[in-house]
Design a protein with these regions (language model features):
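Conserved acidic donor-binding segment of nucleotide-sugar-dependent glycosyltransferases
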Residues: 288-289, 293-300, 309-314
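A short, well-ordered alpha-helix in the C-terminal region of glycosyltransferases
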Residues: 302, 309, 316-331
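Aromatic "clamp/platform" in nucleotide-sugar-dependent glycosyltransferases that forms part
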Residues: 256
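Short alpha-helical donor nucleotide-sugar binding micro-motif in glycosyltransferases
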Residues: 68, 235-236, 243-248
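Short, structured helix-loop element that forms part of the nucleotide-activated donor/catalytic region
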Residues: 39-48, 203-228, 240
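Conserved donor-binding/catalytic core segment of Leloir-type glycosyltransferases
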Residues: 3, 166-182, 188-191, 205
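Short hydrophobic beta-strand element within catalytic cores of glycosyltransferases
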Residues: 34, 273-276
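Short, small-residue-biased leader/transition segments that mark boundaries at the very start
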Residues: 1, 6-8
Length: 352
């Protein structure tokens, strides 16, 4: 089987593709990953048992074409590979096009997306948000769910570190690069809207690289105004992220456009609920008040109301642990992913 990917950075989409490698190998496939360059995740594919070819010319459809036609089955990862899908549509090789993209990913690529797909192509997405983004430009495409699987980090032996952010208070964290669509400014405004006596009862942590100056400035101003309660950390190691998930009370994802935020899923692994924007893939899976909370309209005031409730009732969030774990096991566990991916591959290859 051949997997086509645009560059191989260490970010959500390639890491998720890595999780498909052992499943495909267990089905008897040899896995070859083809991308134009290595952005840092190449070793993850090799460790998972795949072969990897990086070649800048593989963006030229004819170059990837010959290899793809020799494969039993092709996974095309993300909407940026639309040209490859267009080239393979209508051929004899089964193609699974797996979408992880936000609405923001579409304007510059929409003209390359085929208007019709051949019988050999099936489209899958990591949830309703990613499907809605494609449906905004191709409403007639049939898109099925294929949510990524994450390992059960809570069952692993990792080096536990007391990160020191709790300070004996409920801790609410957000993790991810600082860009406008991630909505750090909305979270900052919500923290400012809290009554002072409520804000003082909690700690807030922002983790991520500063990609957007406006987002970073809003966090810097907040840490300057409330140095006892609001903290910023550029990056944490994988083990420190796991420690954070263990130590936090809950997570906050204020994104304006986010297909399926990985850190929210990591929180579920440790039984931690999140407060998320309706513009996240996670929102479509949450049962309000049972395994998380959803606010609407990118409204900091609505987020502040939910935050205040969570700060005043940390025991309520702690009691959601079982339901959060259930949500992970049902939708995001390696077992759930393997079951869905196997069924998708079998369905596609049976058509041959």
């Amino acid at each position: 089987t051949l997997s086509l990917h645009d560059a191989l950075p260490i970010s959500g989409a390639p890491i998720v593709l890595v999780s498909a490698v052992p499943v495909l190998r267990s089905m008897g496939y040899e896995v070859l990953v083809l991308g134009p360059s290595d952005g840092g995740s190449l070793h993850l594919f090799l460790d998972a048992g795949a072969s990897v070819i990086t070649r800048s010319s593989c963006r030229n459809v004819s170059d990837a074409w010959g290899m793809a036609l020799c494969a039993d089955f092709v996974i095309v990862n993300m909407v940026v590979m639309a040209r490859a899908v267009r080239a393979l549509s209508g051929t004899a090789v089964p193609v699974l096009w797996w979408l992880h993209d936000a609405f923001a990913g579409y304007p510059h690529i929409a003209h390359q997306i085929p208007t019709q797909l051949g019988e050999n192509v099936r489209v899958y997405s990591v949830g309703s948000h990613a499907a809605n983004a494609m449906h905004a430009v191709r409403p007639e495409f049939e898109i099925r769910p294929l949510i990524y699987g994450l390992p059960d980090y809570a069952a692993e032996n990792f080096v536990r570190t007391d990160l020191g952010y709790n300070r004996g208070r409920p801790l609410f964290a957000t993790v991810g690069s600082f860009e406008r669509r991630k909505g750090h400014d909305i979270f900052c405004k919500a923290i400012r809207l809290l009554p002072p006596e409520v804000r003082e009862k909690a700690s807030f942590l922002f983790v991520g690289q500063a990609a957007d100056k406006e987002m970073m400035d809003s966090v810097r101003a907040l840490t300057a105004d409330y140095p006892e309660n609001v903290f910023y950390c550029k990056r944490l190691t994988r083990d420190e992220i796991k420690s954070l998930m263990e130590q936090c009370t809950g997570l906050v994802c204020a994104s304006r456009d986010d297909p399926m935020p990985t850190f929210v899923t990591e929180g579920l692994i440790f039984g931690k609920p999140s407060i998320v924007s309706e513009h996240t893939g996670t929102a479509g899976l949450i049962s309000e008040g049972r395994n998380g909370f959803v606010y609407h309209d990118d409204d900091p005031q609505q987020l502040a109301v939910l935050l205040e409730h969570a700060i005043e009732h940390p025991e309520e969030l702690a009691s959601m642990r079982t339901e959060c774990r259930k949500m992970y096991e049902q939708y995001y566990s390696k077992e759930a992913f393997e079951q869905t991916l196997r069924a998708a591959v079998e369905d596609l290859t049976a058509k041959k």
